[in-house]
Amino acid sequence: MNALGRHILAEIYGCDAAILNNRNLIEKIMVESALEAGAEVREVAFHKFSPQGVSGVVVISESHLAIHTWPELGYAAVDVFTCGEKVNPWDACNYLTERFKAKHMTATEVKRGVFEEPVKVANL
């Protein structure tokens, strides 16, 4: 691979508002999505806003997953950034879309740390 990692920017629409407004459930689903993708979870931090919305991050050995929700719009903005080749960020995005009971998801993949020559990084 000539890139250090893959960064998925996902727009998830038509989600269940009750799910998107539940901090504990969002944290659980985000951790599950990281594990579903084959990642190793290191740390988590989530915050519930008033009157609604949740933001959070799951730090993984391979990078991170982040989310910001707008329950009133049924919308979640999700970033899944993974380094190396053993973790598939699309698996996490698809898992989240399913668990949020979303109507649809659009996403863009960005290669991060692109080098002209193949790179070899320890433990990746």
Swiss-Prot record:
GO terms for molecular function: adenosylmethionine decarboxylase activity. Binds 1 pyruvoyl group covalently per subunit. The active site is at S63 (schiff-base intermediate with substrate), H68 (proton acceptor), C83 (proton donor). It catalyses: S-adenosyl-L-methionine + H(+) = S-adenosyl 3-(methylsulfanyl)propylamine + CO2. Its EC number is 4.1.1.50. It comes from Acetivibrio thermocellus (strain ATCC 27405 / DSM 1237 / JCM 9322 / NBRC 103400 / NCIMB 10682 / NRRL B-4536 / VPI 7372). GO terms for biological process: spermidine biosynthetic process. Is synthesized initially as an inactive proenzyme. Formation of the active enzyme involves a self-maturation process in which the active site pyruvoyl group is generated from an internal serine residue via an autocatalytic post-translational modification. Two non-identical subunits are generated from the proenzyme in this reaction, and the pyruvate is formed at the N-terminus of the alpha chain, which is derived from the carboxyl end of the proenzyme. NCBIfam families: SAM_DCase_Bsu. One of its GO terms (cellular component) is cytosol. This is S-adenosylmethionine decarboxylase proenzyme.
